């Protein structure tokens, strides 16, 4: 019983789990370039609306 932490858990301030998607909250597959912080699924949906174009 001595191993139980008292108080709230520490939040992650760096690394892969520290950021999340601004739209859905997912932490995996983030597009962090240009400070977008969208997951790849949300980025595919919103990229044309933001002005990104798919090249061949």
From Swiss-Prot:
Entry keyword set: Metal-binding, Ribonucleoprotein, Ribosomal protein, RNA-binding, rRNA-binding, Zinc
Binding residues for Zn(2+): 21, 24, 39, 42
Keyword Nucleus: no
GO cellular component, as recorded: cytosolic small ribosomal subunit
Highest taxon listed in the record's lineage: Archaea
Any one biological process term the GO annotation gives: cytoplasmic translation
Cofactor(s) essential for the protein: Zn(2+)
GO molecular function terms noted in the UniProt entry: rRNA binding; structural constituent of ribosome; zinc ion binding
Cofactor mode of binding and number, as noted: Binds 1 zinc ion per subunit.
Xref: PANTHER family: 40S RIBOSOMAL PROTEIN S29
Subunit note: Part of the 30S ribosomal subunit.
Function: Binds 16S rRNA, required for the assembly of 30S particles.
Family assignment from sequence similarity: Belongs to the universal ribosomal protein uS14 family. Zinc-binding uS14 subfamily.
HAMAP family hit by this protein: Ribosomal_uS14_2_A
Name of the protein in question: Small ribosomal subunit protein uS14
């Amino acid at each position: 019983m001595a191993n139980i932490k008292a108080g709230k858990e520490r939040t992650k301030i760096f690394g892969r789990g520290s950021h999340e998607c601004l739209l859905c909250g997912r932490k995996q597959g983030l597009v962090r370039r240009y400070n977008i912080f969208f997951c790849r699924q949300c980025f595919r949906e919103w990229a044309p609306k933001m002005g990104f174009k798919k090249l061949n």
